[in-house]
Amino acid sequence: MGTEESDDFVVQLLRENRRLKTELNRREGIASSRWWRLHPRLNAERMLTALRGPREPPRVAPSMLPREQTVPPPVPSDLVGRFRREVIGHGTFSHDWFTGHIPSWEPMMRALEGRTARVLEIGAFEGLSTCFVLWRLPDATVTAVDTFAGSAEQVARDLLPNGSLEHVFDANVAHVDGTRARKLVGDSKRVVLDLHAEHARFDFVYVDGSHLALDVLIDAALSWSLLTVEGFLVFDDYGWSAVGPDPLLRPGPAIDAFLELVDGKYEVVSKGTQLALRKKSA
């Protein structure tokens, strides 16, 4: 995809994202896949097919995904326990949605250890995954992007911590090593465009900022070109469907659509409730 086409891609997705959110609010969250309108040069037909049709397994490196859902390799015997004692036990975390993913993250952490790995996290919440990376990779730096306003779902379900979410994040990260964390407050679509302007590059990208398909697709598309070849891209909530089957209200269909767009440029590292990829070519 050329530079002009890439710019068209971003502009069109941002415009469609604003339109969709307006319509979602008007119809109280009831959406339809007919609202997808993408530029023809963006392989819109393939994206629509991926969103509307039955999910196909992503393309896989044969040695890496022998079955429908990968079984993570063993982690050091007390890695999770030490993290809970040394970090979670001294922080303020109202929810633990992360430590169950440590076994699938560990092979990627091993690949990054011993170097100054650059990590981008889209969606930080209270900083639990941020803290894990800082704790697990003492030489890594983390750029964490979040509005720190909480999602509509978190507000509706009263899942936000008492006090300022941003202050909770700051305190938790400071306990590990706040000097290696860069906090960027704002909508990820705008913030990641600013990172493009800085010519930033990352070795690991974690996309966990929204459950809306268009948000997920835009976050993935914008961060892909920031990811180094052989770097890792991890999507959270691959199978999440708590609000029903509508493809625009779930991350999974957007992730599958993104995989169609970058077909041939990645291999799957692990697949379960999260999907982890390794970028093989630009």
Put a short name on every predicted segment.
Residues G2-A282:
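A short alpha-helical cap/connector motif
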